[in-house]
Amino acid sequence: MRKLIIEPLTKEAFAPFGDVIETDGSDHFMINNGSTMRFHRLADVQTAQPEDKAIISIFRAEALPMPLTIGMLERHPLGSQAFVPLLGNPFLIVVAPVGDVPESEATRAFVSNGRQGVNYHRGVWHHPVLTIEKRDDFLVVDRSGEGNNCDEHYFAESQLLVLDPHPLEG
């Protein structure tokens, strides 16, 4: 099993997979008579069909036991999916490039600083939300519409990956 190296989440490193949603270094302008700073268009919601709708949900995630064997990734071929942490806690992100199936060798892991969210572009393979805390809440923006928008791929035994965030502690 290949151990995934957990990288800091940066816009540059994550660009092949989607957008990092954060205020640091982002364009902004003042609104509401100068009382509010708007960080505008941090990510685009992608949908496949004109009749699709962008929806907002909250996911309450439970921590999985670590180290974690990564045996499955999913993708959303009909729309993007964004996760923004609501409680300010760091969380883990596991992604692989767009393709017919995810390539185990191309899979990468990132850690958010708790003030960063991510927007997975259409078709990007990713692990379901991975909280480090016992329980965490995420604002989720994704697509609602006709058609199956979730494909799952299970890795063969020889392609399994392991994720161990414990080096992040301390």
From Swiss-Prot:
EC number: 4.3.2.3
Catalytic activity: (S)-ureidoglycolate = urea + glyoxylate
Gene Ontology biological-process annotations: allantoin catabolic process; purine nucleobase catabolic process
Cofactor annotation: Ni(2+)
InterPro entries: RmlC_Cupin_sf, UAH_cupin, Ureidogly_lyase, Ureidogly_lyase_bac, Ureidoglycolate_lyase_dom_sf
Pathway(s) of this molecule: Nitrogen metabolism; (S)-allantoin degradation
Molecular function in Gene Ontology: ureidoglycolate hydrolase activity; ureidoglycolate lyase activity
A Pfam family per the record: Ureidogly_lyase
Keywords recorded for this protein, A-Z: Lyase, Purine metabolism
SUPFAM superfamilies listed in its UniProt record: RmlC-like cupins (SSF51182)
Domain of life assignment: Bacteria
Positions in coiled-coil regions: none
Subunit structure: Homodimer.
Function in brief: Catalyzes the catabolism of the allantoin degradation intermediate (S)-ureidoglycolate, generating urea and glyoxylate. Involved in the utilization of allantoin as nitrogen source.
Family the UniProt entry places it in: Belongs to the ureidoglycolate lyase family.
HAMAP family linked to this entry: Ureidogly_lyase (MF_00616)
Protein name: Ureidoglycolate lyase
Native source species: Pseudomonas syringae pv. syringae (strain B728a)
